[in-house]
Amino acid sequence: MSTRHHIAAALLALGLGSLSLGAHATHYPLKVDNCGYTLEFSKAPGSVITVGQAGTEMLYALGLGSKVAGTSLWFNPVLPKFKDINAKVPRLADNDPSFEAVVEKRPGLVVSQFEWQIGKEGVVATREQFHDLKIPTYLMPSDCEGKDNLVGA
């Protein structure tokens, strides 16, 4: 399964959308293994904060733009087909948002594109900082599986 499909499947499993892709209904409580953490959900997250353009545009592509409560870290302009929905989503920062800016939105889930943003030495925060506040974090598997981000390999 490609990374993009893996991420899409995980986000759909979290119940963030009601797209019909031939999948079975999501049942709660739900456990999702992600980059060394087990995330537990008693219900589908009502809102998501994204740290990274890739995760944001993936949610838009899945029809979940209305669930994105804030976004940050953009390297390029949004794709033209997502321009309208993106205009409705608050930009917390063009680069790395502050921990406080993310927490202030009270998200049900934070999705991060890179571990250096939300990870062991995250410039935004560690995953534990969010988890201590009962805010689950989902890290793109392509940035953690088989990779040691502390040494850049």
Language-model region placement:
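Bacterial Sec-exported substrate-binding components of ABC uptake systems
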Residues: 3, 12, 16, 20-57
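Extracytoplasmic substrate-binding proteins
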Residues: 28-31, 38, 109, 125-153
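A short, structured surface patch at a secondary-structure boundary
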Residues: 47-120
